[in-house]
Regions:
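Terminal transmembrane helical anchor/hairpin motif
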Residues: 4, 11-12, 24, 29-77, ...
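Secretory targeting signals
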Residues: 32, 128-181, 185-186, 190
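Long, hydrophobic alpha-helical segments
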Residues: 80-105
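Hydrophobic/aromatic residues in alpha-helical transmembrane segments
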Residues: 96-100, 112, 148, 183-184, ...
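Transmembrane helix boundary and interhelical loop/hinge segments in multi-pass membrane proteins
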Residues: 97-117, 131
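Short helix-to-coil transition segments within interhelical loops
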Residues: 115-123, 237
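Residue-level detector of conserved catalytic or cofactor/ligand-binding positions
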Residues: 232-242
Length: 242
């Protein structure tokens, strides 16, 4: 099992590093948007007022899971509403399916499929190994994103800040949600014998989760979803001015 785990880490290492580093660097724009008052006014205040009309649409606000429009355009709101809630589960779920497909196709391409097949492991052990790598992959990439994003928060005097501990807790929840969508989608696709169906199953599960979560705020029938939700991300912390 240890050899198989090493193999699964070695084969997609470039893929994993690309996802971890590129996403984190891109997300630096969130804290840097609060670098000073003029930058914040240009990037944040302008957008808040431009889309102000959306806050008057209760259906749109419920669908997006927004209760306070102005709080969306704080550093906290940008991290939770714009990043951790909608994008992390979507991106990590997608990356998980790509990773699992990549491991199988790479094994057939470079001839290591025979190596994997020759390992003294049961089917359950193979699935357990894949589950371990999948969870570790999702956690590593997501924590890399938020830790890279946190560098300006920790080293620069921004107009708003976030506490590290609550942010990491929210990161863990978002990462596990994304891994769950990806792994479940891939598992259902593998069960049907059509790997392409993994995308349909994973996307379908995520769409169902988002829709039922949105409806739970206005329809009592969907209240039970709030307790079972995979994408119910707690807020990192209230933003504070420096």
């Amino acid at each position: 099992m240890l050899n198989y785990l090493k193999y699964m880490i070695r084969v997609p290492r470039k893929f994993i590093l690309n996802w971890a580093i590129s996403g984190g660097v891109y997300l630096l724009i969130l804290p840097l948007a609060f670098a000073n008052s003029s930058v914040e006014s240009l990037l944040i205040d302008t957008q808040r007022e431009a889309f102000r009309g959306m806050s008057e649409n209760d259906t749109a606000m419920s669908l997006l899971g927004i209760s306070d429009w102005d709080n969306v355009f704080t550093l906290e709101g940008m991290v939770t509403t714009y990043f951790l809630v909608p994008f992390v589960p979507l991106l990590i779920g997608t990356a998980t399916i790509i990773l699992l497909n990549k491991l199988g196709s790479k094994a057939e391409e470079d001839g290591t499929f025979e190596f994997v097949a020759s390992l003294p492991m049961t089917r359950s052990t193979v699935y357990l190994s894949q589950a371990i790598i999948t969870v570790l992959f999702g956690l590593f990439v997501t924590f890399a994103w938020t830790n890279i994003m946190f560098i300006p928060i920790a080293t620069m005097e921004l107009s708003q800040t976030l506490d590290y501990g609550p942010l990491m807790k929210a990161t863990l929840q978002a990462a596990l949600a994304g891994v769950s969508f990806g792994a479940l989608g891939f598992a259902l696709g593998a069960f049907t014998g059509k790997s392409s169906m993994a995308w349909a199953f994973g996307g379908g599960l995520m769409a169902f989760e988002y829709l039922t979560n949105s409806l739970s705020g206005t329809n009592d029938f969907f209240q039970w979803v709030d307790d079972l939700s995979l994408i119910h991300i707690s807020e990192p912390t209230r933003p504070s001015s420096i």
